[in-house]
């Protein structure tokens, strides 16, 4: 079976790993604590695709998602990798 990188599909938004150095600034800007960010499963196909490039992504890592928007050009969302909500 051929492997397919979901991040290459035009309907899948860009996913980026947020460097640890930037996490504090993002959380401060959003006025939120990391545990209150929406969650993304470590088994999500986009996370698996990022792991193929960057290696294992640990829980607690913040993922930046950039979605194309017809009204705003693009919109940015943040998710934290966490499996406890998906059990």
Swiss-Prot record:
Keyword terms of this UniProt record: Cytoplasm, DNA-directed RNA polymerase, Nucleotidyltransferase, Transcription, Transferase
Catalytic activity: RNA(n) + a ribonucleoside 5'-triphosphate = RNA(n+1) + diphosphate
Intracellular or extracellular location(s): Cytoplasm
EC numbers for this chain: 2.7.7.6
Pfam families the UniProt entry points to: RNA_pol_Rpb5_C (PF01191)
InterPro entries cross-referenced by the UniProt entry: Arch_Rpo5/euc_Rpb5, RNA_pol_subH/Rpb5_C, RNA_pol_subH/Rpb5_CS, RPB5-like_sf
GO cellular component, one term: cytoplasm
GO-annotated molecular function: DNA binding; DNA-directed RNA polymerase activity
Biological process, per Gene Ontology: transcription by RNA polymerase II; transcription elongation by RNA polymerase I; tRNA transcription by RNA polymerase III
HAMAP family, per database record: RNApol_Rpo5_RPB5
Subunit structure and binding partners: Part of the RNA polymerase complex.
Protein role: DNA-dependent RNA polymerase (RNAP) catalyzes the transcription of DNA into RNA using the four ribonucleoside triphosphates as substrates.
Family affiliation: Belongs to the archaeal Rpo5/eukaryotic RPB5 RNA polymerase subunit family.
Protein name: DNA-directed RNA polymerase subunit Rpo5
Species annotation: Thermoplasma acidophilum (strain ATCC 25905 / DSM 1728 / JCM 9062 / NBRC 15155 / AMRC-C165)
Lineage: Archaea, Methanobacteriati, Thermoplasmatota, Thermoplasmata, Thermoplasmatales
Gene that encodes the chain: rpo5
């Amino acid at each position: 079976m051929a492997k397919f990188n979901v991040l290459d599909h035009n309907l899948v938004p860009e996913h980026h790993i947020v460097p640890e150095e930037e996490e504090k600034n993002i959380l401060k800007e959003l006025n939120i604590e990391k545990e209150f960010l929406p969650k993304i499963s470590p088994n999500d196909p986009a996370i698996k695709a990022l792991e193929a490039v960057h290696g294992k992504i640990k829980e607690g890592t913040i993922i930046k998602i950039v979605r194309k928007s017809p009204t705003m050009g693009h919109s940015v969302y943040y998710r934290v990798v966490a499996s406890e909500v998906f059990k």
